[in-house]
Design a protein with these regions (language model features):
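N-terminal/domain-start alpha-helical segments
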Residues: 1-55
Length: 55
């Protein structure tokens, strides 16, 4: 399963990605809205974990 993690706090995003990686999920990270929008336009994901308070 390919997951996009959209989170502006890098430490939290890294922790989530590390945990999911141990569970054999393929994770990509986006730290800004623009980065997430670009990745969503290019790649396909099975799931998006979105920070609702993203600036």
């Amino acid at each position: 399963m390919k997951i996009l993690i959209v989170e502006d706090e890098r430490e939290l995003s890294d922790s989530i990605a590390a945990y999911l990686g141990v569970e054999n999920y393929l994770c990509e990270q986006a730290f800004t809205y623009a980065d997430a929008k670009m990745k969503l336009g290019i790649y396909e994901y099975d799931c998006v974990l979105l920070d609702l308070m993203l600036p």
